[in-house]
């Protein structure tokens, strides 16, 4: 299963917004975040993105005292952004139409393996972690533009450790109520 249509749609935002400006004089602000994670996310194992899915899988492994099994080698690299950072940057983008097409990313690639161990630590999971290399890794890298760092060099992104810990704490507390 692939997300090529989702990725393509994100790329088309910029093209469409430019076309509206040229043809109709309309200004649109398109912000395209990398992998968003945080409280209130969709933690459903069938339909969630990587961070909430891994948090949910780790929680199940913890509660059931089973290994935390992760698809693939853990080597692919991704960029993650905490939802409150996306909110702050989106509000900023509305006030700065000169930066109408911006990829929201801390500009730091993290391996899936690093993410898995960050989640396991935040969850206090000390069981076995298995990377099932019979399952696909997906694309190795999905690099993004670092234009945001040039435009807002002083913006302080939430460190992955802090964002993951806050998300894990919320998920555990709200397990009975959250979307899963």
Region spans (language model):
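Active-site Tyr-X1-5-Lys
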Residues: 1-34, 50-64
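Short acidic-hydrophobic sequence patches enriched in Asp/Glu that either
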Residues: 46, 50, 111
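C-terminal substrate-binding subdomain of Rossmann-fold SDR/epimerase-dehydratase oxidoreductases
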Residues: 60-180
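Structured catalytic cores of enzymes that bind and process phosphorylated ligands/cofactors
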Residues: 8-13, 22, 38, 83, ...
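Active-site loop/turn elements of alpha/beta-hydrolase fold enzymes
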Residues: 33-36, 73
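Short beta-loop-alpha junction of Rossmann-like oxidoreductase domains
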Residues: 39-42, 147
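Active-site "substrate specificity/gating" loop of NAD(P)-dependent dehydrogenases
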Residues: 1, 42, 46, 73
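Short, conserved glycine- and acidic-residue-centered signature motifs
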Residues: 9, 47, 141
């Amino acid at each position: 299963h692939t997300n090529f249509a989702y990725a393509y749609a994100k790329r088309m935002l910029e093209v469409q917004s430019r076309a509206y400006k040229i043809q109709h004089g309309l200004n649109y602000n398109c912000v395209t975040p990398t992998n968003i994670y945080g409280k209130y996310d969709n933690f459903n194992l069938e339909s969630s993105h990587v961070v909430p899915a891994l948090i949910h899988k780790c929680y199940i492994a913890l509660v059931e005292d089973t290994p935390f099994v992760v698809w693939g080698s853990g080597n692919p690299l991704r960029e993650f952004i905490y939802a409150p950072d996306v909110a702050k940057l989106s509000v900023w983008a509305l006030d700065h139409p000169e930066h109408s097409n911006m990829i929201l990313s801390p500009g730091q690639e993290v391996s899936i393996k690093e993410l898995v161990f960050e989640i396991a630590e935040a969850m206090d999971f000390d069981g076995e972690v298995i990377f099932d290399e019979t399952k696909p890794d997906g694309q190795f890298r999905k690099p993004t533009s670092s234009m945001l760092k040039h435009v807002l060099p002083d913006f302080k992104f939430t460190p992955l450790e802090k964002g993951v810990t806050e998300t894990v704490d919320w998920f555990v507390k709200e397990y009975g109520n959250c979307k899963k």
